[in-house]
Regions:
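Active-site bordering "gate/hinge" segments
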Residues: 1-278, 302-350
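A short beta-strand signature within small-molecule sensing/ligand-binding domains used
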Residues: 281-283
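Acidic, carboxylate-rich catalytic segments that either coordinate divalent cations
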Residues: 296-297
Length: 350
């Protein structure tokens, strides 16, 4: 069994999403990390969950701090600025490299020419950048995107527009985070209780008894101001727009565009959250008396969005069985962080 997992999409079928990421269930992460502390936990999670590894490491640091100290983790302007840069990097990497392939294209040298001339590296750096490095890379990304206008990913958006506007998945956003801190703490405790009680909750999560989705369009900062997201097109656009917002924000933001933090729960427990490129990431930990990991759970955006009964699954079921372009368009709107493929059924002709 591959712990990394994969998803197979079946347009026009039920179930329309088959697969999972086994490492997230069966208390496997807890067993993998049991007895470890501090940097050992952080580095292991970054190596196991490699996509958006910076967010995994950040969230692990916060949850371990909150569980050991039993006080909220410190979120500094410098760490927030770094999170915004790395999230923008995640967005660009997915759009520049994944989108063309999901449109049945091979990556052509001409499509990547603007990337080869861009000083901004797509690879996540092996260490956390210093503030001056963050500022320099933000500038590099802004300069590099100036030459992206005629190329991917804007070409991909233009090619998807008609298809994506016609795809109208149901919308029930995950609203665990809240502008009211008392309500947010209650919501986080509810999730923590579910994670602790059920080792497989992170594989098939539900919020208040139903499936929910998380993404750029469900950010805490936009909860009251953002227009309703009704189409795959809205979701795809939101990712491009947020990337531009993240690299254009002040170097030391006074208001965080991405929410993150940790809540101590008592008795060596804590839960931490981080708004990352694909949506809301949650970590829960139980430490023993020596501050070593006794149990650990990670609840990632992909498990919400690729739930077999969620909005994406229902939208896939409504497609024609041979509609691979629409299936890939939907998948890109929700952006899985594990391997994903589309299974097409041949329609017999009379």
């Amino acid at each position: 069994m591959s712990l990394a997992g994969q998803y197979l999409l079946h347009p026009g079928s039920h179930p329309s999403i088959v697969g999972s990421r086994p490492v997230m269930g069966g208390a496997r992460l807890g067993r993998l990390l049991r007895g470890q502390q501090g940097d050992g936990v952080v580095n292991m999670l970054g190596n196991v969950l490699t996509l958006c590894a910076h967010a995994q490491r950040r969230t692990a640091c916060m949850v371990l701090w909150a569980a050991e100290k039993q006080e909220p983790a410190q979120v500094t302007p410098e760490s927030t600025s770094l999170l915004q840069l790395e999230t923008a990097r995640d967005h660009l990497r997915s759009m520049a490299l994944d989108w063309p392939q999901r449109q049945s294209q091979s990556l052509q040298p001409a499509q990547l020419k603007w990337l080869s001339g861009c000083q901004f590296p797509l690879a996540t750096p092996p260490r956390a950048l210093m503030p001056d490095e963050v500022a320099a890379q933000r500038q590099q990304m802004r300069e590099g995107l100036k030459s992206a206008t005629p190329c991917t990913p804007l070409q991909c958006l233009a090619q998807w527009q008609a298809t994506a506007q016609a795809l109208q998945p149901g919308t029930r956003t995950l609203d665990v985070l809240d502008t009211n801190p008392v309500q947010q703490a209650a919501n986080l405790r509810t999730i923590a209780t579910a994670l602790a009680a059920d080792p497989d909750f992170a594989l098939r999560p539900q919020w208040q008894g139903a499936c929910a989705e998380t993404g750029v369009w469900s950010r805490l900062r936009q909860r009251k101001a953002a227009p309703a997201i009704t189409s795959a097109w809205s979701r795809l656009q939101a990712r491009w727009i947020e990337m531009l917002e993240l690299i254009s924000a002040p170097t030391e933001p006074t208001v965080a565009l991405l929410s993150s933090g940790a809540l101590p729960l008592g008795d060596g427990q804590a839960i931490a959250w981080c708004e990352m490129a694909r949506g809301l990431l949650l970590h829960w930990v139980q430490l023993d008396e020596q501050h070593r990991v006794q149990d650990y759970r990670v609840l990632a955006p992909t498990e919400w969005n690729f739930h077999p009964n969620g909005a994406l699954a229902q939208a896939l079921t409504q497609l024609k069985p041979d509609d691979a372009p629409a299936a890939w368009c939907l998948a890109s709107a929700y952006d899985p962080c594990v391997q994903c493929s589309v299974n097409i059924q041949e329609i017999p002709h009379a």
